[in-house]
Regions:
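TPR-adjacent "capping" and linker segments in tetratricopeptide-repeat scaffold/adaptor proteins
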Residues: 1-12
Length: 66
């Protein structure tokens, strides 16, 4: 994959995760955020704090913490 493709995929995963959160589908949102976090770590060496926050929001809605 090229960096441009990676950025597009990252954006799609984040947008999908946010949409799922709005639908209260937090387990599915977490899957998207985990993929986005992994991709971001591969691209930048660490995950963006906003991605981690988005995932944490869904975890809290499910009564979980990581």
């Amino acid at each position: 994959m090229t960096e441009e493709n990676d950025l597009e995929m990252l954006e799609e995963l984040v947008n999908r995760g946010i949409s799922l959160q709005r639908e209260a589908k937090h387990k599915e949102a977490i899957v998207c955020f985990n993929k986005a976090i992994s991709l971001d770590e591969n691209m930048n060496g660490e995950a963006d704090s906003n991605l981690l926050r988005l995932k944490n929001n869904s975890l809290m809605k499910l009564g979980r913490d990581e």
